[in-house]
């Protein structure tokens, strides 16, 4: 882990250190808010210049135009400036020209551009176009009967798109029955694989992606179980206790002595502290398990995740969401919003401070340096989210 991160140069939380960032109620100080806002404006200008040379055919949320639209929708929600809505509109149109009819997910497939477009048209009071996008989104379910189940390319990533629409419309635009039907498919698929590979006694559910049993949030078990425990998926109490909980407990047993988690079952190298692989993604599963099952052990493991991230989370890979410092900082915000413990808000602010020095640490330049999940757009999204910490949610993943 240590060789993939910069040593954390910051002192950990104490009350007097935190006073420069937020008050006793957790509201950011005007000075720190201004620093964040100034950096957001500066990075947006850099990003817009950089996007002129981005791949014109990539419409995805992860590395393409839909992701930039997600950022501008978020900035519109945070700052209320209609100019951001217009910018989002331009990127939505570009993303809709890039649909591939191959993948169904929010981040890497057609569901992202369609869901984002539906929400954007709704905000612009263009309900006819919004409805058209929703219809197309619902029909995507038929594209790939052999889709995997994970977040980036699988059924969970499709479910996120459906929930994203319902949340932003404030009404059930996507019928609950449609969401539950996909959820049932995910559960059945997990039971079948667990039986086939002799996992059932240890873990009643099992999922693979490219012949590997991934553990993390992006491709693996933690991301899938985080969703299966969401109230909006309406998994029955019986199945939550008989299928999901023992499967979550199996993931908990994979924890390294450090408090981190392996990228795959059977991989004993304790290296990756990313949202996609490791503690920064697993923490969401643990917190959701604590909310649903009210067992202290899940919270203890989540605290351990946060300590690993504080120590090893300032990544040499960069400042992005998927495998970067901004994505890792969201773990602190999630824990803060659960516990109201100011230590975690402070840690998020310190990781934001690191991001305020974007490009000055000698990090690796990502393949898509301005994108939502690998690059600058994701960092901007995080800095804007931190302005109102209680509303912060890891984009395209956290509910």
Swiss-Prot record:
Localisation: Cytoplasm; Cell membrane
Tissue expression per record: Detected in erythrocytes, brain, kidney, testis, ovary, heart, lung, placenta and spleen (at protein level). Ubiquitous. Strongly expressed in brain, spinal cord, pituitary gland, kidney, heart, skeletal muscle, pancreas, ovary and testis.
Sequence positions that bind Zn(2+): 276, 322-323
InterPro entries: 6hp_glycosidase-like_sf, LANC-like, LanC-like_prot_euk
Membrane topology: Peripheral membrane protein
Protein's GO biological process: carbohydrate metabolic process; cellular detoxification; G protein-coupled receptor signaling pathway; peptide modification
SUPFAM superfamilies named among the record's database cross-references: LanC-like (SSF158745)
Modified residues (N-acetylalanine): 2
Keywords of this entry: Acetylation, Cell membrane, Cytoplasm, Membrane, Metal-binding, Transferase, Zinc
Binding site for glutathione: 317, 364-367
Modified residues (N6-acetyllysine): 142
Gene3D superfamilies given in the database record: 1.50.10.10
First-tier enzyme category under EC: transferase
One Pfam family this sequence matches: LANC_like
Catalytic reaction list: RX + glutathione = an S-substituted glutathione + a halide anion + H(+); 1-chloro-2,4-dinitrobenzene + glutathione = 2,4-dinitrophenyl-S-glutathione + chloride + H(+)
GO molecular function, one term: glutathione transferase activity
Its EC number(s): 2.5.1.18
GO CC, one annotated term: plasma membrane
SUBUNIT field: Interacts with the C-terminal of STOM. Interacts with the EPS8 SH3 domain. Interaction with EPS8 is inhibited by glutathione binding. (Microbial infection) Interacts with P.falciparum SBP1.
PANTHER family recorded: GLUTATHIONE S-TRANSFERASE LANCL1, LANC-LIKE PROTEIN
Extra remark beyond the main annotation: Was originally thought to be a G-protein coupled receptor.
Family: Belongs to the LanC-like protein family.
Function summary: Functions as a glutathione transferase. Catalyzes conjugation of the glutathione (GSH) to artificial substrates 1-chloro-2,4-dinitrobenzene (CDNB) and p-nitrophenyl acetate. Mitigates neuronal oxidative stress during normal postnatal development and in response to oxidative stresses probably through GSH antioxidant defense mechanism. May play a role in EPS8 signaling. Binds glutathione.
Protein name in the entry: Glutathione S-transferase LANCL1
